[in-house]
Amino acid sequence: MQNQEHKTALLVMDLQNGIVQHLGDNLEEALVPYEKAIKAAREHSIPVIFVRVGFSKGYPEISPNNKAFSAISNYGAMTVNDEATQIHKLVQPEGNEPVVTKYRVSAFAGSNLEMILRAQQIDTLVLSGISTGGVVLSTLREAADKDFKINVLADACFDRDQEVHKVLMEKIFPRQADVLTVDTWIDTLN
C-alpha cells in the first residue's frame, strides 16, 4: 500500500539489452534484485517507471562535443527502435507502466520523466539501475536539486568498477539519499 505521507515511484534505469550485457555471464542471477524490487513495487501499488537511453535515426540529439555520446553515433547503434535500447525481457514493463526515453546520462535529460512524476504527485524516488557511476549518480543529483526525497537500492545498482560503486554508496549518495538493500526497502513497505 502506498504511504499517504509520501508518494513513491520506483525508477528502473537503463536495464536495456545493450547495457545489461555488462552484468556478466550470470545475467539472470544479476537481475534478481531488480526483479524483486519491481515485484514488490507492483504488489504495493508503487508506480514503476522504466528509463532507457535511445536516439533518433541520424542522431540529431548528439553533439560532436559530447565525449561520452559522440562515439555512439559512429557505431550506428542505440536508436530508439534498435534492439539494444529495448528493456530486457526479464524486467519488462507491464500494462501502462511508462518507458521514458532519455538522451543523456540523467533520467531527466531530455525526457518527460519530471512531467510524469509531477502529474502523479510523486515526491519520493527509489533508484535502481546500471550504472551506479552513470545514470544512478546523475539522476540522484538532479532529483536532489529538484527536491525529491530519494532512496537508492544498493544491490539493484551496478557499476563495472566496484570501487566506484562502493565509494558512491558509502560516501557520496548518503549525503542526498537513503541507501538501502532491496530487502530492507521491501521491509519498510510492510
Q: PLM ranges: what are they?
A:
Residues Q16-H22:
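Short acidic, Gly/Ser-rich segments with clustered Asp/Glu that frequently serve as metal-coordination loops
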Residues H6, G24-A41, S45-G54:
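A short alpha/beta connector and helix-capping loop motif
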Residues P47-V48, R52-A71:
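Early exported N-terminus immediately downstream of N-terminal targeting peptides
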Residues L10-L15:
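Acidic-leg catalytic submotif of subtilisin-like serine proteases
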Residues G18, S56, D159:
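Active-site loop signature of alpha/beta-hydrolase-fold enzymes
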Residues M1-A9, K36-H44, S70-N190:
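Active-site-adjacent betaalpha module
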